[in-house]
Amino acid sequence: MRHYEIVFMVHPDQSEQVPGMIERYTGSVKEAGGQVHRLEDWGRRQLAYPINKLHKAHYVLMNVEAPQEVIDELETTFRYNDAVLRNVIIRTKHAVTEASPMVKAKDDRKALAEVENNDFEDAEE
């Protein structure tokens, strides 16, 4: 089986359906004997340019190991699902399990905010 990186963008009005979509897609990978190595829900983000007069979209990143038939099925599902605005499926040489720069930056910001908040509370005392 080959390794793939999949990113898809969902219509912002359909954000509440994203967990169900993720479950359905990961389920189809696992049913075929594949494996999900990384799954990141980046949430609603600003688009670089408008797509269908929309300025935001809900982003999801998945790194999977799956047979080609499953990837073809996912690609067809993305194509005919009106909620999916854009998608990209890239074959990779090996499994990627470490956090993406998007998640790392988000975690760094959270850690920095906690440190600043603790420093502020210490200064008040």
Curated annotation (Swiss-Prot):
GO BP terms: translation
Superkingdom of the organism of origin: Bacteria
Gene Ontology MF terms: small ribosomal subunit rRNA binding; structural constituent of ribosome
InterPro entries membership: Ribosomal_bS6 (IPR000529), Ribosomal_bS6_CS (IPR020815), Ribosomal_bS6_sf (IPR035980), Ribosomal_S6_plastid/chlpt (IPR020814), Transl_elong_EF1B/ribsomal_bS6 (IPR014717)
UniProtKB keywords: Ribonucleoprotein, Ribosomal protein, RNA-binding, rRNA-binding
NCBIfam families: S6
Primary role: Binds together with bS18 to 16S ribosomal RNA.
Family indicated by similarity: Belongs to the bacterial ribosomal protein bS6 family.
Protein name as catalogued: Small ribosomal subunit protein bS6
Lineage: Bacteria, Pseudomonadati, Pseudomonadota, Gammaproteobacteria, Pasteurellales
Gene designation per UniProt: rpsF
